[in-house]
């Protein structure tokens, strides 16, 4: 979860150590080469600056006093200075090029790791985290890491080496001037600590507000139709303005403090330079301690070089704090517990040989559960029939709030079970338990006599085709959207599935037919057409059992007939669980379960429930609300 607004990372030292550990693991050799190049660059510049003393004292000054001007020694000396700085330029160019590769490589590693972990997380994680906040990790937080790896870390190391080498050289040149320089630097450090701390706090708040704004924008983009239907454009704009104002305020404060710090330190550096020039000039004129004009020129250059990294460090502190805050969120994601799967029973294609079930490498239309025994006995194969039993099941999304109570039911192979009830009755929750998006607190769920906890989750879900009320379509062709149900399906199988779902007709009327690329989650398709594609996607998977969340309440009558006909074809011969939104679509169900506050209060066929004149009767006659 995100840090509290304005609160920095809890353990920056641990985060930095972990980040450096990842860098060294993936790019250890490159980092060492970069460090060597930085050291060479700094030492080359320091050597060039130190040589300036000799250049002035041993070459320029004697040349000015000499009556015969021989410039050859001076040119040789200038050539040596040029060599020093040339080496520095080459080293600087080299480490910057290497850091580009390291930075982009690490960002790729982070994104790969984040996406891999995201795919391993349970549905519960996405139910409890804003999607915009997760997206912000991939964009904003990784960008702060990019700045830290590519700029802040090399500059900090460069600054540290520069400060150490420059300090040594300044002490060698003149101790009193070095003490004066340190006094001014002390003032700069005090201001940096004070102002930098305030700035860092607001930069953390800025990161939090960016994630909030991103989340709201994504939510509004997805719900734009709803906004326009209810004419809530102004209200949405007002809500956005409040969030945007908070972001603007935190950004203003963060950058205001940050922007003040640089100029203040720069001016203090200039004051330090002027004071050293005045005092050093007096010392050089009086030749105090053998201090010369060349020594003064070198020292003033070192003074500038010393103040510059101090200023750079102060400017990079906020970038590092922001990056570590982003790294903390990324590492929190990477440290999330993946979805636990202790199952060992697998789903396999099967065939019969000599009256016995055996596995098949080809799709045969016959499925079996492969039960591998740990005691060395041969694998047992149990035919998948679609026999599902709930035995006294209790469930709550949190331990202190149970939403399903003592639910017991059974679905025989090929039966159609329908769930009806008001909003929050527990209809969708039951289907979430069947495919183990969540695990139950008490009781048992058996699938063909096997406790579903023993079945591998991927195999369990592969046996269950799901058609959701809100169909999600990917930014790919219609053909590939259908093929998503089974990636190895041929074009002929895709078109056959579309025909079974009654989707072939409208697909062929699209501009490029099956090759039409859908964008915006298929926004240019009607709800009914989207539902038909969802049915085709489930049909191509050819699952032994189905979970249908009907969406016929939001489509026209003609399309409803097409959708219902497609669903009927898909349900034929399969155990099917239906979340009903229209009672007219489930009258032919083998059993209808009426739920209320997480309990099954009625069950039976359509006719049996009408005869009871209970809750179902009220729903059917319009005396109660169905959702």
List each language-model region with its residue ranges.
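Hydrophobic patch in the ABC ATPase nucleotide-binding domain
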Residues: 123, 226, 336-339, 494, ...
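An intracellular "coupling" helix at the cytosolic face of ABC transporter transmembrane type-1 domains
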Residues: 123-124, 142-149, 153, 157, ...
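Juxtamembrane helix-loop junctions of ABC transporter transmembrane domains
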Residues: 5-13, 44-60, 83-131, 135, ...
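Conserved catalytic Walker-motif region of ABC-type ATPase nucleotide-binding domains
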Residues: 118, 240, 390-392
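Helix-loop-helix
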Residues: 62, 169-183, 253, 257-328, ...
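Membrane-integrated ABC transporters
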Residues: 1-45, 60-81, 95-99, 103, ...
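ABC-type nucleotide-binding domain
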Residues: 67-68, 350-627
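Transmembrane helices of ABC transporter permease
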Residues: 26, 30-43, 84, 90, ...
């Amino acid at each position: 979860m995100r840090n509290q607004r304005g609160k920095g990372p809890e353990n920056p030292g641990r985060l930095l150590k972990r980040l450096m550990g990842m860098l060294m693991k993936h790019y250890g050799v490159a980092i060492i080469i970069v460090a060597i190049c930085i050291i060479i660059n700094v030492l080359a510049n320091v050597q060039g600056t130190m040589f300036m003393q000799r250049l002035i004292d041993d070459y320029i000054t004697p040349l000015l006093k000499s009556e015969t001007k021989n410039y050859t020694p001076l040119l040789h000396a200038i050539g040596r200075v040029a060599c020093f700085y040339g080496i520095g330029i080459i080293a600087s160019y080299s480490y910057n090029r290497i850091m580009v590769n390291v930075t982009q490589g690490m960002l790729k590693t982070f994104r790969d790791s984040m996406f891999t972990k995201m795919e391993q997380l349970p549905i519960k994680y996405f139910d409890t985290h804003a999607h915009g906040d997760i997206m912000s990790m991939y964009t904003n937080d990784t960008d702060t890491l990019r700045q830290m790896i590519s700029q802040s870390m090399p500059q900090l190391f460069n600054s540290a080496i520069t400060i150490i080498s420059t300090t040594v050289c300044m002490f060698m040149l003149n101790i009193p001037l070095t003490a004066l320089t340190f006094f001014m630097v002390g003032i700069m450090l005090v201001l940096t600590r004070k102002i930098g701390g305030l700035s860092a706090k607001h930069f953390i708040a800025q990161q939090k507000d960016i994630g909030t704004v991103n989340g709201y924008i994504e939510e509004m983009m997805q719900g734009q139709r709803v906004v326009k239907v209810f004419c809530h454009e102004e209200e949405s704009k007002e809500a956005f303005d409040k969030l945007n104002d908070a972001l603007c305020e935190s950004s203003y404060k963060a950058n205001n403090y940050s922007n003040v710090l640089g100029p203040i330190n720069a001016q203090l550096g200039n004051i330090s330079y002027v004071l050293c020039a005045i005092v050093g000039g007096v010392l050089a004129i009086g030749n105090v301690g053998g201090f010369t004009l060349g020594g003064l020129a070198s020292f003033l250059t070192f003074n500038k070089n010393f103040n510059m990294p101090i200023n750079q460090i102060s400017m990079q502190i906020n970038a590092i704090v922001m990056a570590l805050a982003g790294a903390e969120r990324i590492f929190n994601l990477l440290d999330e517990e993946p979805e636990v799967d202790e199952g060992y029973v697998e789903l396999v294609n099967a065939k019969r040989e000599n009256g016995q079930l055996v596995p098949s490498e080809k799709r045969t239309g016959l499925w079996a559960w492969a039960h591998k025994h740990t005691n060395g006995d041969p694998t047992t194969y149990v035919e998948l029939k679609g026999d599902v039993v709930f035995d006294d099941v209790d469930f709550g999304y949190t331990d202190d709030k149970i939403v399903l109570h003592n639910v017991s039911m059974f679905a025989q192979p090929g039966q159609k079970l329908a769930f009806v009830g008001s909003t929050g009755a527990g209809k969708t929750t039951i289907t979430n338990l069947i495919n183990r998006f969540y695990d139950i607190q008490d009781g048992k769920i058996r699938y063909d006599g096997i406790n579903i906890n023993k079945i591998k989750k991927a195999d369990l879900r592969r046996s269950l085709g799901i058609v959701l009320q809100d169909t999600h379509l990917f930014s790919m062709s219609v053909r590939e959207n259908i093929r998503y149900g089974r990636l190895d399906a041929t074009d002929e199988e895709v078109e056959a599935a579309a025909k079974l779902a009654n989707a072939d007709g409208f697909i062929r009327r699209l501009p490029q037919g099956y090759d039409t690329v859908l964008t915006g989650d298929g926004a240019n398709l009607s709800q009914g057409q989207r539902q038909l594609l969802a049915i085709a996607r489930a049909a191509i998977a050819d699952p032994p059992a189905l979970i249908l969340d009907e969406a016929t309440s939001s489509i026209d009558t003609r399309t409803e007939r097409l959708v219902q006909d497609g669903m009927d074809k898909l349900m034929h011969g399969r155990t099917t669980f239906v979340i009903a939104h229209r009672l007219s679509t489930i009258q032919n169900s083998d059993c209808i379960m009426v739920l209320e506050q997480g309990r099954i209060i009625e069950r039976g066929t359509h006719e049996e429930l009408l005869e009871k004149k209970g809750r179902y009767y009220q729903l059917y006659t319009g005396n109660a609300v169905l959702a």
